[in-house]
């Protein structure tokens, strides 16, 4: 009796569901017939479609067919136990679930293609609108040469027949005239002051003040000078490069002089009372040339001609 009451309560809902289902089936059937007619009349071109969407449509169609078959069996009061349609539904559902991540990745491209097919143009904010124009990559060699045209006109005036111009022209590189760099005195002083500030920030005095007043943990180093540590680092890098590339690097005259100067600094005691110049950071006044040490001034003047002295013959 209780089971009969449950069935009677479900009857009105089932009837409404069947009526709604019948209306939906009628609309879907009309829509599918309309699309089929347009495809057969070549209104919609489906030759170059996406195989992924075609596979998805076929799987959904098979899924609906098996589901409809099982609903028909249950409506007729038959048992669906052991029905092969259940295994097919599980398999199709698994494949459709596995295809969902691929569908999400292709969603942007599919929407863009559909929008371009409907509107006939890309969107205003589409990144492909800002791609390079291939027409700008056309060779300029096919353009008429001005010099050849001028020479052709002069030949025509002189009575000489003008030769037909060939399509392939000779490439003429543009002529670039050297321009002198005008460096004012203010710009030169500003550049020297900036260099002095950079050297002052990397000096040992600023580094020691930073270590003294900084809250960071103190870094314990070997008791060696900073210039020696830098020299050892460069030398180790040089050795590693020579060993890895199996080649010997030749030192220039400038590098040899710098190495000799660095090695000689360790044996000199004259620099004990020499502190780094940080006047560029404190706003000290003075010439810009005095702020940057070790600046060699080039001497401009007439070069003396070197003439070999030979022995003069003495006549007897």
Swiss-Prot record:
<dbReference type="GO" id="GO:0032040">
    <property type="term" value="C:small-subunit processome"/>
</dbReference>
<feature type="compositionally biased region" description="Acidic residues">
    <location>
        <begin position="145"/>
        <end position="156"/>
    </location>
</feature>
<dbReference type="GO" id="GO:0000462">
    <property type="term" value="P:maturation of SSU-rRNA from tricistronic rRNA transcript (SSU-rRNA, 5.8S rRNA, LSU-rRNA)"/>
</dbReference>
<keyword id="KW-0137">Centromere</keyword>
<dbReference type="GO" id="GO:0005737">
    <property type="term" value="C:cytoplasm"/>
</dbReference>
<keyword id="KW-0966">Cell projection</keyword>
<dbReference type="GO" id="GO:0000775">
    <property type="term" value="C:chromosome, centromeric region"/>
</dbReference>
<dbReference type="Pfam" id="PF04000">
    <property type="entry name" value="Sas10_Utp3"/>
</dbReference>
<dbReference type="GO" id="GO:0030175">
    <property type="term" value="C:filopodium"/>
</dbReference>
<comment type="function">
    <text>Part of the small subunit (SSU) processome, first precursor of the small eukaryotic ribosomal subunit. During the assembly of the SSU processome in the nucleolus, many ribosome biogenesis factors, an RNA chaperone and ribosomal proteins associate with the nascent pre-rRNA and work in concert to generate RNA folding, modifications, rearrangements and cleavage as well as targeted degradation of pre-ribosomal RNA by the RNA exosome. Its dissociation from the complex determines the transition from state pre-A1 to state pre-A1*. May inhibit mRNA translation.</text>
</comment>
<dbReference type="GO" id="GO:0005730">
    <property type="term" value="C:nucleolus"/>
</dbReference>
<dbReference type="InterPro" id="IPR007146">
    <property type="entry name" value="Sas10/Utp3/C1D"/>
</dbReference>
<keyword id="KW-0539">Nucleus</keyword>
<feature type="region of interest" description="Disordered">
    <location>
        <begin position="124"/>
        <end position="169"/>
    </location>
</feature>
<comment type="similarity">
    <text>Belongs to the SAS10 family.</text>
</comment>
<keyword id="KW-0678">Repressor</keyword>
<feature type="compositionally biased region" description="Basic residues">
    <location>
        <begin position="296"/>
        <end position="316"/>
    </location>
</feature>
<protein>
    <recommendedName>
        <fullName>Neuroguidin-B</fullName>
    </recommendedName>
</protein>
<keyword id="KW-0810">Translation regulation</keyword>
<dbReference type="GO" id="GO:0030425">
    <property type="term" value="C:dendrite"/>
</dbReference>
<comment type="subunit">
    <text>Part of the small subunit (SSU) processome, composed of more than 70 proteins and the RNA chaperone small nucleolar RNA (snoRNA) U3.</text>
</comment>
<keyword id="KW-0158">Chromosome</keyword>
<dbReference type="GO" id="GO:0006417">
    <property type="term" value="P:regulation of translation"/>
</dbReference>
<keyword id="KW-0963">Cytoplasm</keyword>
<dbReference type="GO" id="GO:0042274">
    <property type="term" value="P:ribosomal small subunit biogenesis"/>
</dbReference>
<feature type="region of interest" description="Disordered">
    <location>
        <begin position="292"/>
        <end position="316"/>
    </location>
</feature>
<dbReference type="GO" id="GO:0030424">
    <property type="term" value="C:axon"/>
</dbReference>
């Amino acid at each position: 009796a209780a089971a009969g009451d449950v069935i009677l309560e479900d009857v009105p809902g089932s009837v409404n569901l069947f009526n709604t289902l019948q209306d939906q089936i009628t609309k879907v059937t009309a829509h599918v017939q309309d699309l089929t007619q347009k495809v057969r009349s070549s209104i919609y071109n489906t030759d170059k479609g996406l195989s992924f969407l075609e596979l998805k449509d076929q799987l959904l169609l098979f899924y609906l067919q098996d589901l409809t078959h099982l609903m028909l069996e249950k409506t007729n009061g038959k048992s669906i136990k052991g029905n092969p349609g259940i295994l097919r539904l599980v398999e199709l559902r698994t494949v459709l679930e596995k295809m969902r991540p691929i569908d999400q990745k292709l969603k942007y491209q599919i929407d863009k293609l559909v929008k371009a097919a409907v509107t006939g143009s890309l969107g205003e904010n589409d990144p492909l609108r800002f791609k390079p124009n291939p027409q700008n990559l056309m060779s300029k060699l096919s353009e008429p040469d001005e010099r050849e045209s001028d020479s052709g006109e002069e030949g025509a005036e002189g009575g000489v027949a003008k030769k037909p111009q060939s399509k392939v022209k000779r490439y003429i590189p543009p002529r670039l005239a050297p321009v002198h760099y005008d460096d004012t005195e203010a710009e030169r002083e500003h550049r020297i002051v900036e260099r002095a500030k950079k050297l002052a920030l990397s000096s040992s005095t600023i580094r020691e003040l930073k270590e003294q007043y900084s809250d960071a943990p103190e870094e314990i180093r070997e008791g060696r000078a900073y210039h020696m540590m830098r020299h050892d680092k460069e030398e180790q890098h040089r050795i590693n490069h020579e060993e890895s590339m199996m080649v010997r690097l030749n030192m220039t005259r400038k590098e040899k002089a710098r190495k000799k100067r660095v090695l000689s600094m360790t044996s000199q005691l004259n620099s004990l009372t020499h502190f780094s110049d940080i006047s560029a950071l404190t706003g000290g006044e003075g010439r810009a040339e005095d702020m940057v040490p070790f600046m060699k001034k080039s001497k401009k003047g007439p070069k003396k001609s070197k003439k070999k002295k030979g022995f003069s013959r003495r006549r007897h």
